[in-house]
């Protein structure tokens, strides 16, 4: 699992930063999932080593333009390129109406290539490998934060030990690999977990924007390996943040601290903190790190590989 930031500016693009877009690469599936799709996202994809044909799912947090104005261009390009698979899009109320209006007035035929899912708090998507959930955030319009959870994987099966115990090969090995207890023909009961190493702990990524500090963000981010959280304003501009229902750098850090996440990556920065101004992004980073040291700043095209957690080794001998 690897995160690539395609846009990290709030509201409008700058020369160095595009508006919101984050890709989650899933190499084991040859897929990428996109979180928000601001204007120019497909251009950012062209400048990265991602391909639009890899995108299978798009998760939209809310209906503000800097998070959705790139959708129709990307969808049109993917349709012309013939990706060969339907595109699943998840988002808040109004998303499908917006897309269908764009389709109608631009005379673009989406057809069955696009499947739009209205999200509600709770489960959004689940398969054998991943689960995606969402909770409402606190913004001026309906907004959701997303949590991607990779499911734990069984530990490595010790074939040599199984053979030493005289367990005959066959379908029974499949049950043992799943940690099940099986009964052999000679009456012996074998616990599959005794033949497997420690499970690989699934990784967790949380994406929270746009929002002012709220308890649901803390709940959503609990024990995440990576929390991507907006930090539109500096602490000095907290009054403006509360008025516009955006977060300061210190709010993002407080969410990370309370949720006990492993890594905080801040994004969605106001252009007012560009180099040369009274306050810069270096100041926002220092503010956050004073509360939560494991904080870094996102920039366009930054890639971050989510590390696996280390489990206690279990002897297989």
Swiss-Prot record:
Its cofactor is Zn(2+). One of its GO terms (molecular function) is 3'-tRNA processing endoribonuclease activity. SUPFAM superfamilies: Metallo-hydrolase/oxidoreductase. It catalyses: Endonucleolytic cleavage of RNA, removing extra 3' nucleotides from tRNA precursor, generating 3' termini of tRNAs. A 3'-hydroxy group is left at the tRNA terminus and a 5'-phosphoryl group is left at the trailer molecule. The active site is at 66 (proton acceptor). Its EC number is 3.1.26.11. Zn(2+) 1 binds at residues 62, 64, 139, 210. Zn(2+) 2 binds at residues 66-67, 210, 268. Keywords: Endonuclease, Hydrolase, Metal-binding, Nuclease, tRNA processing, Zinc. Belongs to the RNase Z family. This is Ribonuclease Z. It comes from Picosynechococcus sp. (strain ATCC 27264 / PCC 7002 / PR-6) (Agmenellum quadruplicatum).
